[in-house]
Structures are given as structure tokens and as C-alpha cells.
């Protein structure tokens, strides 16, 4: 929240909305309270890889179609617990960290604080920042596509986002091939935000982090 408050270019009105959204994050950690039923999915080692993948894709599609016309289930996970990844879902304003990523090298109970903040801390901050990047900022605290920014603040955000995109545009990948800063803008914003959040948390944890 203090990073929001430190934005000199953002109005108090938009800051208040940003705080509302941040405070309304739905956090999922480890594994869901209820598990998916996979009894309808047949995985046959005697079949071809294609046949198994096709059945899995059909099973997943039918599973998704069952939600049509029903109220949104906020307890539903869109990633399995064993997946080494994390996500932010703007349409439900949720952040999810499966059990798979809560282990080395991302999190180690015996590691130094700096190691964990530099690993899982950055990941957590990255996903949180997605709620306020060029895509996530278009959704409100309830996950609705709703413009909660003042026009002046939106203009200031776009101006700064363009600077970041241009910075990445100048990265040479190979010979004359450059990175596309606009294509990766959301991830770049989230990376920068994740680093700032993790480092700020480390400062509060360690009495003298600069000396360690």
C-alpha cells in the first residue's frame, strides 16, 4: 500500500480506489479446499500421445462449459497445486500460489531472508503488481471491467508505461533483432513492481540489510 501512497502523480481519488482493490485481493495458497473430480478422464498408456491429449482437451472444455450460466465460484482454482507457477486473475481479482512453487529454489525455510524475498517474494510482488499493470488496472476490486481511474491519472500511467516499453524496445536480442517492450509491457511492469515490493519487505525484516 505504501507504494501506492508514494506515487506523486496519482490523485487521492485514484489512490483510494487502488487501496480498495489491493485490500480486496482474494488470496489462494497451497491447494484448494475442494478437489476436481477426474473420474471422467481416461488416460490410457496404450493409446497414442495425441489420443490422450485430445481426450484431456475435450474433458477440460466440457468442464469449463459446465460453468455457463452459473454464479462465479471464487473458490475454483485455475492451476493445479503441483504446478511450479503462480497467477493473478483480473476477472476475480485473485492471486494464487500453488504448493509447487512454495519449495526450493523459490522458497526455502532454512534460507536467509534475503534469498526468500529475492525468490518467492519477487513472485508474490509480481502477481500483486499485475492487478495494476496495463491490463489489470482496467478491472475494479470485484473483477469487473470498470474504469476506476481519473482521466488525468490514466494519462500519467500511459505516459510512464510508454517510457518503460521504450526501454525494453532498445534491448538487442540478437544482431538487429530488438525486444518488443509493448508486447511484454504487463510482465515488465510486474517484474519491476515485484522487485520493489520484495526489497521493501526485506528492509522491514532486516535491521541492516545493506550491511548483510
Please annotate each region the language model reported.
Residues 1-206, 212:
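Intrinsically disordered, low-complexity linker/terminal regions across diverse proteins
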Amino acid at each position: 500500500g505504501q507504494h501506492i501512497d508514494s506515487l506523486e502523480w496519482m490523485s487521492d481519488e485514484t489512490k483510494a480506489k487502488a487501496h480498495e482493490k489491493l485490500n480486496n485481493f482474494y488470496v489462494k495458497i497451497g491447494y484448494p479446499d475442494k478437489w476436481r473430480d477426474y473420474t471422467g478422464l481416461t488416460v490410457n498408456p496404450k493409446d497414442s500421445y495425441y489420443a490422450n491429449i485430445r481426450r484431456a482437451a475435450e474433458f477440460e472444455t466440457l468442464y469449463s462449459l459446465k460453468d455457463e450460466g452459473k454464479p462465479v465460484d471464487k473458490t475454483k482454482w485455475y492451476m493445479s497445486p503441483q504446478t511450479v507457477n503462480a497467477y493473478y486473475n483480473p476477472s476475480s481479482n485473485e492471486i494464487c500460489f500453488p504448493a509447487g512453487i512454495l519449495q526450493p529454489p523459490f522458497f526455502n525455510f532454512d534460507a536467509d531472508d534475503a534469498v526468500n524475498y529475492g525468490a518467492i517474494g519477487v513472485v508474490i510482488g509480481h502477481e500483486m503488481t499485475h492487478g495494476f499493470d496495463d491490463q489489470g488496472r482496467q478491472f475494479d476490486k470485484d473483477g469487473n471491467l470498470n474504469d476506476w481511474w481519473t482521466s488525468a491519472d490514466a494519462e500519467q500511467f500511459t505516459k510512464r508505461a510508454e517510457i518503460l516499453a521504450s526501454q525494453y524496445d532498445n534491448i538487442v536480442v540478437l544482431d538487429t533483432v530488438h525486444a518488443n517492450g509493448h508486447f511484454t509491457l504487463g510482465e515488465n511492469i510486474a517484474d519491476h513492481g515485484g522487485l520493489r515490493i520484495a526489497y521493501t519487505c526485506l528492509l522491514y525484516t532486516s535491521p541492516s540489510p545493506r550491511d548483510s
